[in-house]
Amino acid sequence: MTADRWAGRTVLVTGALGFIGSHFVRQLEARGAEVLALYRTERPQLQAELAALDRVRLIRTELRDESDVRGAFKYLAPSIDTVVHCAAMDGNAQFKLERSAEILDSNQRTISHLLNCVRDFGVGEAVVMSSSELYCAPPTAAAHEDDDFRRSMRYTDNGYVLSKTYGEILARLHREQFGTNVFLVRPGNVYGPGDGYDPSRGRVIPSMLAKADAGEEIEIWGDGSQTRSFIHVTDLVRASLRLLETGKYPEMNVAGAEQVSILELARMVMAVLGRPERIRLDPGRPVGAPSRLLDLTRMSEVIDFEPQPLRTGLEETARWFRHHTR
């Protein structure tokens, strides 16, 4: 399937002013799609950048309000070919720990309203950004897509994980009961340009960049041995669109092949910024799963490109960070 698969199609993107959603908007518009960009929180600079694109229409919508979502679909649905669902309440480990109830409530309402509208208004296909965090118990081997709630389901007080699990179960049931053509993407840790630092919920890479660029030490929660796989946001978007183009699998892990410890990551961030190594470990803070290794067999079958190495992506991200935060 070539890039012109998206030319002339109308794609609705939720969370369009968010980190991942904004990259979907840009890539889809560049490939010839008409993009209906739904957002809730104002971000004036990004809004202006996206509004300047030829085929992007920004629409403020409260996805947690069913009447607001239905109103938007009633007006827009006749032209929608595809829905890309990126909107979610998210944050770092501390944010998820402190606001689990809010996250669960917000995310489960959002996905419920969206899938109901995809069904009721006859949208042809949808892709949902899920999470690799739903593999609650880290397996000894790489987690395959089948190693989810269907194989082992247990309670967790992590509202984010619960919300993503609920969303996947609901999507699966919509697929089975209503024939909804819905796909699920489970990313590793996503990073790249556009992921600004928010002290209250910032992800690991922008948090490290902010500290290192300011000449401060990087604080690592735990002993730094916990490992993650990272995926550049543009590679995530490309892989997700390829999944829609091929329709090969209902669920797919998306991540880089490299497994990097958080301590190694901190050293890499310091190096790309040209800063001396200043790192402090804090064993008393929440660290999440000790590892999150993903089976990438499906992804390797679907994509037609090579994801960029972490070091290369970090260098680009650091350049963006310095240009946009000074």
From Swiss-Prot:
InterPro entries: Epimerase_deHydtase (IPR001509), NAD(P)-bd_dom_sf (IPR036291). GO terms for biological process: antibiotic biosynthetic process. It is an enzyme of class 1 (oxidoreductase). It holds the Pfam family Epimerase. The active site is at 160 (proton donor/acceptor). This is dTDP-4-dehydro-6-deoxy-D-allose reductase. Its EC number is 1.1.1.364. GO terms for molecular function: oxidoreductase activity. The gene is chmD. It catalyses: dTDP-6-deoxy-alpha-D-allose + NAD(+) = dTDP-4-dehydro-6-deoxy-alpha-D-allose + NADH + H(+); dTDP-6-deoxy-alpha-D-allose + NADP(+) = dTDP-4-dehydro-6-deoxy-alpha-D-allose + NADPH + H(+). It comes from Streptomyces bikiniensis. The lineage of its organism: Bacteria, Bacillati, Actinomycetota, Actinomycetes, Kitasatosporales. NADP(+) binds at residues 15-21, 129-132, 164, 187-190. Gene3D superfamilies: NAD(P)-binding Rossmann-like Domain.
